[in-house]
Amino acid sequence: MNYSHTPAGYNSFSEYYDALMQNVGYDERCRYILEIFKRLDHDMGLSLDLACGTGSLTIELKKNGVDVYGIDASYDMLSHAREKAEENGLDILFLCQKMQSIDLYGTIDTCVCTLDSINHLVKMSDVQKTFERVSLFMNQGGYFLFDANTIYKHREVLADNTFVYDTDDVFCVWQNSLKENNIVEIELDFFEREGKVYYRESENFCERAYSDEELTTMLEKAGFEVVKRYGDMTFEAPKSDEQRVIYVARKK
């Protein structure tokens, strides 16, 4: 059976994305990324935030002096990103392109792709294409940093479980269904209160977890070598029950 999603959609998700992600801590994640590259003695130079969503990390990187621009496949996500950048008085370029077919104006020195964006590609061929496109525009010696949800997380944490998120802005029911090939089908129901009435909107998409061997092999085929693997937000090797792994790959 084939599973797919259309990232150009996310109409409802884009409206509530920031509310659901308010505990991510983008400033802390930005500092973490900067520290990784500091330890590698790498000048980020011209950088790309791939699958940037509503631009929260892009904005934090820009605030910290990184020459960065963002790409996402969702017009709706990018609309919010542009508004937020303007509110922060920042001039950031945002482009609407799919990960697996990015076409940049020139080369880059660094690419970051965070918060399980790679997992949204449920076809291995699309992951390979994404790695190859990033490699095509990456200067030799440049770095590609991304994170990925693990098979453990998909099988043991998300699985067939349901989660509820209750914020000041929205009430969300997050339902997961574990399918073949470590794919999780995700159904989101958003309930927004206006007076005494609740309005419901729904969104659904799929994510796929890949093994370390699969990701490493695809990176090598694209001309990268993995130089670091960390447990999320740490500088230690991933544990057996790690839910998200950070990959740092260098362009050969």
Where in the sequence are the language-model features?
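Class I SAM-dependent methyltransferase SAM/SAH-binding core
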Residues: L48, S56-S101
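Conserved class I S-adenosyl-L-methionine
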Residues: M1-A51
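Residues lining the SAM
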Residues: T114-D116
